[in-house]
């Protein structure tokens, strides 16, 4: 007998999809129907009037707040405040606290009603829309508050039956600073924060669990496609829950949760949900807390963000056994150790349990465009050594989710420093082209590779909603190669990290996948390294993955190559000074018995240098407060580095020259690893002296005031002429260069007939710079269409030779800004010397949203220009054939850019600039920007900029590489302190062979008394050379990795008074050698 009725007396209509879906919004809403829906029963009880209405007997005395106002903008510690300062003011909800960056300490005394002992959990709820940290009575950091994102502090069970006191440190800034009107606007110095919550709450935990159940099913309703049956099942269950729930009958909460099990399963209230179908997992979730070491807040605030974030994460780990968390940046761990050693020791326990996982291997999450190659290696040398020393961990994954482009040699440097995996996601921000793959092999200039994964959810701060899990697969760009995605979740940038709500949502996402399917199978409990291990296993050790060769160019934030020019210039100076100090200190430690290598002092200087290479600091995208810290830090580093250098110089028998010194004793220190044929410098009497050395020593001793090939300056008709035996420069009365003529090749170097610029070279152009967003970060392609040519200069002769000939061009920029450019040409003795046109610009800059550049139209045609990048050359197109080419309208470089054809080329050298473009016949160096957010005064003031044009009668070769090094070197004027000053010691380490092989750095080893020599091939060809070591007794020479660990012992050939070590490098290889004495 059938159960199907004969008669139909209960008609059922088809649900109207839009209405039934929209209805669901009511159930969790705090809006007009709150009293009829779930939010009405979130609390069993609440005491919400601390220190308030004395007539309110319920709240009286249960929560008492007293506050200590720190009188300035300092950030005193718990021990400096509690027990030493008076909490003599009462505080209440509705009170305001400020101004911006102020600190307040609260003493919170609570007394729970006896009737609350029955409740499973009691929380203290706090919200002042700023950041705070709870301390126990004995000063242990417990948990952070961060405005609406984190307001609940679960009271320990021991507090539920007693009175207790705890403390809250309040920082008067939001998670993202105190921007006036928008997040990235300059900070509002007078922002105040209102205390809106200081409540004791007994939460209804089943009701909260039902809220998560309903939320995740509602997300499925909204986000699953219309042809998916799970979408409609979720909607029906949600409607059934709304029909079942009654605010006056709490038993209906459990009934509703039972309804939800048909969609979510039975295991979502514990970690057991993740024990099913693990072999089918294709989304691997990992908690993360990205803390910018500085950005919209200063370094000092970051130190507090670290303890707030990490103490909170350890708290969450205790509640969710399946939870694992990664965090990078060795410096931040060091700061925690210095500021909160007790928390650091506790953190170590979680590291040992594989719950809190150090990752990244670097000192900070650094920029990779601006720092030089040695800096990139030092990031890992210091970072990996710290992680190994403190945790016994060597990181295998370079974790850099949020920086503004990725240098072409990063894979090689990673492999040299113990890492073969790389994670980022920033390229998802590209504003022109979509990067084609999510999982791939990234290949460096030399062929070294790392496996790279870009989380397909396109964020490192996922909220663990249904969409985040879906996008971890459906936005994966190459599922044909691998079908797994990493989901990196947690509040980030300003710290914070995952919340309990995120873990609850992940449990339910897993429950959905287990029960009804469709959602990707998410897994918690795998490390990032295990995730990469899985990829390698599934792809035949990566061999079936696509590859990407060379730089990962970021099609956004191109203005960061130029913004905050003073810090960038200091960074260049410091990197070179550290090179010099380590080199001379190494010599002094070997050859002077009374000298010890200043290892700790140099390491401290490197730490500060690497700090300021953080990916918002050095690129120029921080608030002004950060640069008021960073510029003095770098200035102090430069001063102290120079002091160490001079101490080492004095140990070697030399001293700084003075006007009273015997001129016969004057000499120059050359820290370059090759002979320098000529350097013109000024003595204390402002006299020019030409130094040269022909014997390969590191000291230039032959001084001249007359030359075989002098330079001259004169006026011819209305034009001005600079000339030596190699070049003739013709300058118009307005300062533009009309002709740059190679006298040896009888060739005009400039092209003023084609292209945009027909007026002349060294043409300064002021572009309107109004990007679509992110002022300090961005410059856009359309800015190239709106500009003003600065052609109203006035020229006068400054020097007429013979050592140097020069003119000065006085150029108005606007009513507010002005510049003075000196164009000079030097004489020389030997035809092999560098001969180029030098430019020194002194700019008084007071513009708004303008971009100053200088242009050189040259008679060269090639499809590609070459740019020096770290340890190599990166070629970029000079045309706009494709959108990928258009995107590179502004690119980053180091010391030079070169435009060459088969027979001739022009290099533009610089001493502190990083932005460049070469298109058509126009080479353009970026000089200064003037964004107004987030630093309203970025780059305002005086700047000195040096650059040079270096023509060469052949394609790009080692002469340009060496000229750029020479242009950036600081040749210090010395005098011999005694007759015992030994010149031979500067000849102790030489590299002999093909000139494209560069000895880039000499230092003492981190451990022991060995000497480290860093060598790289600079132009892109397999090459041979010989390390020559003189005046020393060598036990052995080994090739080692970037962490200075031996790889292989090399053949060492001994002659009468020196040792030779033959070496062979592949194209663009970076090699490190250890000389064991």
UniProtKB/Swiss-Prot annotation:
GO terms for biological process: mannose metabolic process; oligosaccharide catabolic process. Binds 1 zinc ion per subunit. Its EC number is 3.2.1.24. It is found in: Cytoplasm; Vacuole. One of its GO terms (molecular function) is alpha-mannosidase activity. The keyword Cytoplasm applies. Zn(2+) binds at residues 290, 292, 402, 615. One of its GO terms (cellular component) is cytosol. Gene3D superfamilies: 2.60.40.2220, Glycoside hydrolase 38, N terminal domain, Glycoside hydrolase family 38, central domain, Golgi alpha-mannosidase II, domain 4. InterPro entries: Ams1-like_N, Gal_mutarotase_sf_dom, GH38_C, Glyco_hydro/deAcase_b/a-brl, Glyco_hydro_38_C, Glyco_hydro_38_cen, Glyco_hydro_38_cen_sf, Glyco_hydro_38_N. It catalyses: Hydrolysis of terminal, non-reducing alpha-D-mannose residues in alpha-D-mannosides. Its cofactor is Zn(2+). It comes from the Eukaryota. The active site is at residue 402. Keywords: Cytoplasm, Glycosidase, Hydrolase, Metal-binding, Vacuole, Zinc. Disulfide bonds: none annotated. Degrades free oligosaccharides in the vacuole. Belongs to the glycosyl hydrolase 38 family. This is Alpha-mannosidase. It comes from Schizosaccharomyces pombe (strain 972 / ATCC 24843) (Fission yeast).
